[in-house]
Regions:
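Enzymes that bind and transform nitrogen-containing heteroaromatic metabolites
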Residues: 1-232
């Protein structure tokens, strides 16, 4: 949810490939029970980059593994409520392929919440940025424009938040100054290298910390809003 995007790139799928990675799901809760904050109240849709991140800033370790991002029941409920609120998801090939089993694998619907998540994810409009894919499935389409144009189109088509992931695509959007919020699920582990959550930047990007939350003794949620030049 993948690591955080979604349900940690989503570890719930990784469970199939790495049985020790996670145990799925959980308690039916509504959006209020999941504790989603509606603040700040933007007057437009915003672009969000959300992932689970190690203490030293990585979304996957040096072997490409991210089983350590496996969510608790409480955290998965929060992720599920978040995805319900999205208007679209922009993703790269790897994240798209990681999440595709939610649309194609009937065994992921074995539980009530598994089926619920599969329905929510399948219905979510997705734009896939890839130089190698010739086609995509379900409610997804291949991007036929630049990242900037794709983001503008997605934001213009909804009044809900739009999420972007994995790291390469998000890095391009950050470099273009397009990401409005960073939502980090900080996992208490140091992995020493791997895929960084954030790219190198050539100029400082000022942020406001607008929300924090803890999930048990393991995860800290950090929500940052980019400070725009015209902010007070």
């Amino acid at each position: 949810m993948g690591a955080g995007c979604c349900v940690d790139r989503w570890c719930l799928v990784a469970e199939r490939a790495v049985p020790s990675a996670v145990v799925v799901l959980l308690l039916p809760v509504g959006d209020d029970d999941a504790g989603l904050s509606k603040w700040p109240d933007y007057d437009r849709a915003v672009l969000v980059y959300s992932m689970s991140v190690s203490v030293d800033g990585y979304i996957a370790d040096r072997d490409g593994a991210f089983g350590w991002t496996a969510p608790s029941d409480e955290l998965f409920a929060f992720h599920l409520a978040r995805v319900r609120e999205l208007g679209a998801h922009l993703c790269g090939r790897r994240l798209y392929e990681t999440m595709l089993p939610w649309e194609t694998d009937p065994s992921l619907r074995d539980t009530e919440l598994g089926a619920e998540f599969a329905d929510v994810w399948s219905a979510l409009p997705k734009v896939v940025f890839s130089r190698t894919l010739d086609s995509v499935q379900g409610n997804a389409r291949l991007a036929d424009s630049s990242v900037a144009e794709g983001v503008a189109t997605a934001l213009g088509a909804t009044d809900r938040d739009v999420e972007i992931g994995g790291a390469g695509l998000a890095a391009a959007a950050i470099g273009l100054g397009l990401v409005d919020e960073l939502r980090i699920f900080r996992i208490p582990i140091v992995v020493g290298g791997g895929t960084p959550y954030l790219p190198p930047v050539t100029e400082d990007i000022p942020l406001d910390l607008i929300e924090t939350r803890t999930f048990g003794l393991r995860v800290i949620y950090e929500r940052y809003q980019r400070v725009h030049a015209d902010s007070d």
